[in-house]
């Protein structure tokens, strides 16, 4: 009799994806973050669903409804902070996942990589809209500033912004539609993640060496199921420490003040995971230029396969490229720091230099370094 796991139409899909999947024998812990992102997504959908049961998307009651969730709903505070800090964990995993792809040349799987970039954009859009929902000061002004950037688009900009707002300013209509989009997008993300996985399983996983591993595969279960569970436990531990000991560590105190269109906060800034982009935006004095720079800073990921000039896929055996990679990481951390600082003399120039360095390393130095390393192999 055939095993039901291998014959049942539904079980067969699960089996081929998570049980009998042939996986490289040498993939390191950097390969854990795909499954961690899946866990984050499930956590966000579940906590978000329970929050939506008590939340009201009306400008007069939104702030109060979030307070009500924290004070009156059973474990509402836990659900709310799991959701808020779960988003931070989501982005930490996302950045590491993308960084792993860049380091080990996983971007050579074109379909998987491009869907991954679309996923990144979708998650960023979802997180932005979620940040608007509590209707605090930073929610309101963050929404105003970021949506206003679209007005930099020539000819249609102003109309586009007013169309997104549903009026002449961020108001009730904006909040309602942001809630609707914030609710539906995670399901779009789930569908995209399934397609991401589908394309990945067409080629099989990459590995740290970047060398094809077809001759040395092991079954996903039990080896990588156990490994993923260990990673998940670590992540949940960090998340729970964050939620139970310092739930507001990554938030902004301004968001505990109800939204007031007549009072602008002294420093408008997004959540920490958008600060690097915000720093790039602010480093260019021109509005359209700043918007283009921000979009390019993320869209640059799509160009990675075209910028790959090395004969080796992975950076494992390319020490100079490794140095440049870690320079990009340090540069992004610098940009994140600058994005959270006020616009003052020494900080402005640091932000501008960090922004220039980011594009310089990725677009110029990395491809040239790869060519030099290719020639060094001939010695």
From Swiss-Prot:
PROSITE patterns, A to Z: CYTB_CTER, CYTB_NTER
Chain segments annotated as transmembrane: 33-53, 77-98, 113-133, 178-198, 226-246, 288-308, 320-340, 347-367
Stored InterPro entries: Cyt_b/b6_C, Cyt_b/b6_C_sf, Cyt_b/b6_N, Cytb/b6-like_sf, Cytochrome_b, Cytochrome_b_C_euk/bac, Cytochrome_b_N_euk/bac, Di-haem_cyt_TM
GO annotation, cellular component aspect: mitochondrial inner membrane; respiratory chain complex III
The organism of origin for this protein: Sus verrucosus (Javan warty pig)
Subunit structure: The cytochrome bc1 complex contains 11 subunits: 3 respiratory subunits (MT-CYB, CYC1 and UQCRFS1), 2 core proteins (UQCRC1 and UQCRC2) and 6 low-molecular weight proteins (UQCRH/QCR6, UQCRB/QCR7, UQCRQ/QCR8, UQCR10/QCR9, UQCR11/QCR10 and a cleavage product of UQCRFS1). This cytochrome bc1 complex then forms a dimer.
Sorted UniProt keywords: Electron transport, Heme, Iron, Membrane, Metal-binding, Mitochondrion, Mitochondrion inner membrane, Respiratory chain, Transmembrane, Transmembrane helix, Transport, Ubiquinone
Cofactor(s) recorded in Swiss-Prot or TrEMBL: heme b
Binding note for cofactor: Binds 2 heme b groups non-covalently.
Protein name (database record): Cytochrome b
Keyword Transmembrane helix found: yes
Bilayer topology: Multi-pass membrane protein
Cellular compartments annotated: Mitochondrion inner membrane
Binding site for a ubiquinone: 201
Example GO BP: mitochondrial electron transport, ubiquinol to cytochrome c
Its job: Component of the ubiquinol-cytochrome c reductase complex (complex III or cytochrome b-c1 complex) that is part of the mitochondrial respiratory chain. The b-c1 complex mediates electron transfer from ubiquinol to cytochrome c. Contributes to the generation of a proton gradient across the mitochondrial membrane that is then used for ATP synthesis.
Protein family per UniProt: Belongs to the cytochrome b family.
Miscellaneous note of the record: Heme 1 (or BL or b562) is low-potential and absorbs at about 562 nm, and heme 2 (or BH or b566) is high-potential and absorbs at about 566 nm.
Key word Metal-binding present: yes
């Amino acid at each position: 009799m055939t095993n039901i796991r291998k014959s049942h139409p539904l079980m067969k899909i699960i089996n081929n994806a998570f049980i009998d999947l042939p996986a490289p024998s040498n993939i390191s812990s950097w390969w854990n973050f795909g499954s961690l992102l899946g866990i984050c997504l499930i956590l966000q959908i579940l906590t978000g669903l329970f929050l939506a049961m008590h939340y009201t998307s009306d400008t007069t009651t939104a702030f109060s409804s979030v307070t009500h969730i924290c004070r009156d709903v059973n474990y509402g505070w836990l659900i709310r902070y799991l959701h808020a800090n779960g988003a931070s964990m989501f982005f930490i995993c996302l950045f590491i996942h993308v960084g792993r792809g860049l380091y080990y040349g996983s971007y050579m799987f074109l379909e998987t990589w491009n869907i991954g970039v679309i996923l990144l954009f979708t998650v960023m859009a979802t997180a932005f809209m979620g940040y608007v929902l509590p209707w605090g000061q930073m929610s309101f002004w963050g929404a105003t500033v970021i949506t206003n950037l679209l007005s930099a688009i020539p000819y249609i900009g102003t109309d586009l912004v007013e169309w997104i707002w549903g009026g002449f300013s961020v108001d009730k209509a904006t909040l309602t539609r942001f809630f609707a989009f914030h609710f539906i997008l995670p399901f779009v993300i789930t569908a995209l993640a399934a397609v991401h996985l589908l394309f990945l399983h067409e080629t099989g996983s990459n590995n740290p060496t970047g060398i094809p591993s077809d001759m040395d595969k092991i079954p996903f279960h039990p080896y990588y199921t156990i490994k993923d569970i260990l990673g998940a436990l670590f992540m949940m531990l960090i998340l729970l420490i964050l939620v139970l000991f310092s739930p507001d560590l990554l938030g902004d105190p301004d968001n505990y003040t109800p939204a007031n269109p007549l009072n602008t906060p002294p420093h408008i800034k997004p959540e920490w995971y958008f600060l690097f982009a915000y720093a790039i935006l602010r480093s260019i004095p021109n509005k359209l230029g700043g918007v283009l720079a921000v979009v390019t800073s993320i869209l640059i990921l799509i160009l990675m396969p075209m910028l790959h000039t090395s004969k080796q896929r992975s950076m494992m055996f390319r020490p100079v490229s490794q140095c440049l990679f870690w320079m990009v990481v340090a540069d992004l951390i610098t940009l994140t720091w600058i994005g959270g600082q006020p616009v003052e003399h020494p900080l402005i120039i640091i932000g501008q230099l960090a922004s220039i360095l980011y594009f310089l390393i990725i677009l110029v130095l990395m491809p040239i370094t790869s060519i030099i390393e290719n020639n060094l192999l001939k010695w």
